[in-house]
Structure formats: C-alpha cells, structure tokens
C-alpha cells in the first residue's frame, strides 16, 4: 500500500509542477489574460478613432462647410473680399522684463 501512495504523491507533484510551471501554466494563463485585456482596450480606442475619422470623411464628402473650415484653419485661406487680421497678444515675458527694467530705474 505504501508504494501506491508514493506513486500517487509523485503523480500529484508532477501535475502540480505542470500546473504552476509547465506549458500552459497558470502564470502563462494570467499573462495572456492581461495581454488580451490590454489589446482589447487598444482595439476599443482604435475603433473610436476610426469612427471619428469616418464621420470626418463623411462630413468632408457631403458638404462644403467642413472643407472650408479645414482650409481656413490648416491652410490659412481666406475668401475673396475678406481681410485677414492677426491679433498679437502681449507676451508675459516681455511684460515682466519691462517691469523689471522699470524697477531697476
């Protein structure tokens, strides 16, 4: 009876080793599960991006307003008869340097 128990114990140890450290082990399972969840979240982000791009393409194909807006923003185009004004704000560094020069006087 004792050799039978030893064989069963050895078999159990072998199966436990395969479960924890062998091919398709629990550590590999959890690693793959984590990689799958990361991949799925990346896929979801890409799907959202694709939807935004599809909407933008549809908007550009269907109307001239989006095309005109894009030309104005990205290319700086203006319509005939329009006057372009560039508003230049005060730079905070130049204000500080002028305040410092006034303090030094």
Swiss-Prot record:
Repressor: present as a keyword of the record?
no
Q: Example GO biological process term?
A: FtsZ-dependent cytokinesis
Q: Which residues lie on this side of the membrane: Cytoplasmic?
A: 1-3
Coiled-coil segments: 38-75
Q: Which InterPro entries match?
A: Cell_div_FtsB (IPR023081), FtsL/DivIC (IPR007060)
Using the UniProt record, give the first listed, main subcellular location: membrane
Please give the residue ranges for the topological domain Periplasmic: 22-105
* Compartments (UniProt record): Cell inner membrane
TM helices/strands, residue ranges: 4-21
Question: A single Pfam family, by name?
Answer: DivIC
Q: Which GO terms describe its cellular component?
A: cell division site; cell septum; plasma membrane
Its quaternary organisation is: Part of a complex composed of FtsB, FtsL and FtsQ.
Protein name as it appears in the record: Cell division protein FtsB
